[in-house]
């Protein structure tokens, strides 16, 4: 499940697909603005993201007559989800840093454990690139961090829609009521 944006894929693709990707790109753009001073090799990616953002805004938000209430709601939802993802990634970063300190290790040592360079592990920790599942499993096994704290469990927007349709299709009231009882409503599926 992809919840964290991979800068390489977006730049390779050359455009922003939808509102959630747009919000993720905005967050990544802000992160790059902060780190590019110390990492000049990221300046080109920063500039390319700026062009993608500008193009998306011109195509989707430039004409006021085409901006509907639905589009605004979609944007608000995407912004909320992207912010939840950002907070999750920030908490994960802090949790990993805390464990590194407890084990008397530093970020560079983590890079050695995961087989990554010093600069790449910095990009992973700062959310410029996503950790691989393999990396997160190794971190889980070495440091005893729960997988739920390492791997985002938010359901992507497209899957939410499919899941809502599937729940309606199944039409099993007993199943649905158990879901509601166990999880105080089905809304938990969509956060």
Regions found by a protein language model. Give the residues of each.
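DNA-contacting interfaces and partner/effector-binding or oligomerization modules
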Residues: 1-52
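Key DNA-contact positions within bacterial/archaeal DNA-binding proteins
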Residues: 108, 119, 148
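DNA major-groove recognition helix of helix-turn-helix/homeodomain DNA-binding modules
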Residues: 134-149
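Short basic helix-loop element that most often maps to the first helix and adjoining turn
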Residues: 92-109, 113, 166-173
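Short, charged recognition helix plus adjacent turn
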Residues: 151-191
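Recognition helix of helix-turn-helix/homeodomain-like DNA-binding domains
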Residues: 115-131
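A short, Lys/Arg-rich alpha-helix, primarily the initiator
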Residues: 73-103, 148, 191
């Amino acid at each position: 499940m992809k919840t964290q944006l991979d800068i390489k894929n977006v730049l390779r693709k050359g455009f922003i697909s939808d509102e959630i990707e747009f919000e993720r790109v905005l967050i990544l753009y802000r992160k790059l603005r902060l780190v590019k001073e110390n990492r000049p090799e990221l300046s080109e990616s920063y500039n390319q993201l700026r062009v993608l953002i500008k193009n998306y805004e011109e195509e989707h938000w430039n004409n006021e007559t085409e901006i509907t209430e639905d589009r605004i709601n979609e944007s608000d939802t995407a912004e909320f989800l992207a912010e939840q993802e950002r907070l999750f990634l920030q908490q994960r970063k802090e949790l990993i840093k805390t464990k590194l300190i407890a084990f008397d290790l530093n970020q560079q040592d983590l890079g050695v454990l995961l087989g990554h360079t010093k600069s790449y592990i910095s990009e992973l920790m700062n959310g410029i690139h996503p950790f691989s599942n393999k990396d997160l499993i190794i971190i889980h096994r070495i440091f005893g961090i729960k997988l739920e704290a390492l791997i985002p469990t938010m359901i992507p927007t497209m899957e939410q829609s499919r899941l809502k349709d599937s729940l309606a299709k199944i039409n099993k009231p007993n199943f649905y009521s158990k879901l509601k009882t166990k999880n105080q409503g089905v809304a938990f599926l969509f956060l």
